[in-house]
């Protein structure tokens, strides 16, 4: 409800009159009462709401993904004309969007499945928007979407037509998977700095402030530096009294499931999903901590040197995560005939969304230099960083393993990097085993 309200207010602020409807009369009245003088027109029946709109109608749905979306669409259909446009801005599974697009197209309606990132504040002030569906329908709503979207530093709106049917929601799903990876990498950097150097919260804030001034500059690093110094009403550091169980809404899981369907090695992001799952086993972990043995973390040596190693490991880990995510976008584009523009996708992530970061411009540059590049690690800039930073990533992972600090995504990053640069892997033995017990055959070198 808050996302819908804030998007309505964002659209209204650009000079539009916006018809609003909610199943709950109270919620509709509440939005109007809280925003006096705004060009928001309340409606209390679906029929009245639909008939208030100019044709072709442009209806933005912001409802909980799943059955609720189908129910909302079904309630609208009796009052729609051919050519009307429904925009689903929810966190919808892309296969549902493909189905709805197919069904509504058959009835003469347009359907645009649209990823919206930026949370409640982004919805109000300018989100990153990822629309997919009929191109001609997108052209009719593009002027509004371009006005309400976030603006990158160069003034470009963070919205672009992504591709047919479920493409927009797929890109949003991968965005969310990358977000999981970014957050887990940062959490592991925090664990290393705390475990290896016993940095105080103030020192952590200072470190992250410095990091945010360089190549790691991003929304997530920016908010993390603030989190470290936030205190609760008792004067305790808030981060230290928050239970170490990370929840999830399932979008990271969808990204990993899709990687398995496509045969894509999305190892880092998948480890970040599993890290949340193992965090939720709090009671088991507490019990296991009293039974299972392992090393106690020893000091990591020179402070400045170790902080720099962790910074480098974090940046290279982030690059590996994005390389995997964009590789999966390429596989999905081929599978679903979307013809995705990867440089354009990186561009619309530059502002408004949770993963916004300075280095996204480097991804856009890489695809502009070579649109057909198989993997971002092969692009000149990222190859140079990998050359310079891979040793730091190795050192950090080795330290973590020797000292019993779990770093699943840092470990996944170096394992993927080494696997990807290996001309020969031991998979020949696996294939021989498969042939031995199952006559699966094999290819000779």
Curated annotation (Swiss-Prot):
Enzyme class: oxidoreductase
Protein role: Catalyzes the oxidative decarboxylation of 6-phosphogluconate to ribulose 5-phosphate and CO(2), with concomitant reduction of NADP to NADPH.
Catalytic function, reaction form: 6-phospho-D-gluconate + NADP(+) = D-ribulose 5-phosphate + CO2 + NADPH
Domain of life (superkingdom): Bacteria
A GO BP entry: organic acid catabolic process
Pfam assignment, any one: 6PGD
Family that this chain belongs to: Belongs to the 6-phosphogluconate dehydrogenase family.
PROSITE patterns named in the record: 6PGD
Enzyme Commission number(s): 1.1.1.44
Protein residues bound to substrate: 91, 117-119, 175-176, 180, 249, 276, 434, 440
Keywords of the record: Gluconate utilization, NADP, Oxidoreductase, Pentose shunt
Coiled coil ranges: none
Source organism per UniProt: Raoultella planticola (Klebsiella planticola)
UniProt protein name: 6-phosphogluconate dehydrogenase, decarboxylating
Functional pathway: Carbohydrate degradation; pentose phosphate pathway; D-ribulose 5-phosphate from D-glucose 6-phosphate (oxidative stage): step 3/3
The protein's assembly and partners: Homodimer.
